[in-house]
Each structure stands twice: as C-alpha cells, then as structure tokens.
C-alpha cells in the first residue's frame, strides 16, 4: 500500500513526519501493534473493525518483519 492510497489523517501524519514537524517512531512495528491492540480491545469500536485490527496485529506478530 502506498501513502497516497491511505486516508487523509495518515497522509497528514506522513507529511508531518517527513517534514520533521513530528518525530519518527524508530520501532514502528511495535508502535503499530500497540495501536492495533488498542483498537481490537476497545469495546466502543464496532466488532468488525476490532476483528480487522486483531487480524492485522496477529499477522504482524507472525511475520518475519522486526523493528531495527
């Protein structure tokens, strides 16, 4: 997925990080899993979205990608 395919909020954050306005998170995979976990565990979030977040987090945990 490319940044131009993402929602406006992601594109804004991407531009802020790229410009130095916001700090880069060096352990991005761990940060992503924490964010997905927060969504997956929040009962205020619709069940289908929580399931998507849980599936995405599980795939990251199983994948061979690691934070540098």
Curated annotation (Swiss-Prot):
Pfam families: UPF0253 (PF06786). Coiled coil: none annotated. Transmembrane segments: none annotated. It comes from the Bacteria. NCBIfam families: PRK04964.1 (NF003436). Belongs to the UPF0253 family. This is UPF0253 protein AHA_2115. The lineage of its organism: Bacteria, Pseudomonadati, Pseudomonadota, Gammaproteobacteria, Aeromonadales.
């Amino acid at each position: 997925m490319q940044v131009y395919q993402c929602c406006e909020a992601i594109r804004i954050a991407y531009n802020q990080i790229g410009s130095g306005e916001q700090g880069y998170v060096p352990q991005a995979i761990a940060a992503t899993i924490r964010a997905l976990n927060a969504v997956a565990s929040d009962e205020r979030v619709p069940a289908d979205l929580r399931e998507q977040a849980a599936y995405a987090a599980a795939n990251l945990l199983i994948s061979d990608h690691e934070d540098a």
